[in-house]
Amino acid sequence: MHLVPGRSNIDYSIDFNESLARHMNTVRRARTEDIPSILELLLQVDMVHHNGRPDLFKGNATKYNAEELVAIIENEKTPLFVCVDEENTVLAHMFCIIKQELNDSVITDIKTLYIDDICVDEKARGLGVGRTMFQFIKDYAKEEGFYNITLNVWCCNPDAMKFYEAMGMEPQKIGMEMLL
């Protein structure tokens, strides 16, 4: 990887290490024993957002607590996936929500897989874990008959935006704000 001043230093091209990482890692549904690791990843996500928008994100917090994670894991409408290595160490998580508007007067009856939260552990970044997770979720969504995959990404996280674009995602809608 070449470091370029003023640009993202994340390389999204596949290399030997990434191919190797894909063979050693497994994506599966999260289990209750994964909760401590998921909470650690949620802290990492929060700090990325806090560093980018401290006016909105408190920092050193998690989006969900352990009790809420148990409910998410048990709910079929909120599939939560983790990527683990050969020692069953959680390297990444992906929270999903199944969305479908039925009989809406304007919106068609499509079934959407919404990615609510995704994080690759800081120590596992650059090893293809994110690509492995994303390929898994694409395959899962196709097999389950979803029309599309959607997510929201904060503008203060340009590396994530570049990653999603590299995965083939395109902007669907844009949220805007005016600070007062």
Segment roles from a protein language model:
Residues E67-V82:
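A short helix-loop-beta-strand connector motif used in the catalytic cores of GNAT acetyltransferases and
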Residues R131, Q135, E143, C155-K173:
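Conserved active-site alpha-helix within GNAT-family acetyltransferase domains
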Residues T150-A160, E177-L180:
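Conserved beta-strand-loop-alpha-helix junction that forms the acyl-donor binding cleft
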Residues V82, T89-I98, Y114, C119:
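Conserved beta-strand in the GNAT
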Residues D117-V120, G126-D139, A166:
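Conserved acetyl-CoA-binding loop-helix of GNAT-fold acetyltransferases
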Residues T26-E40:
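A short beta-loop-alpha structural element at the N-terminal edge
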Residues M47-L69:
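Conserved GNAT-fold acetyl-CoA-binding loop/helix
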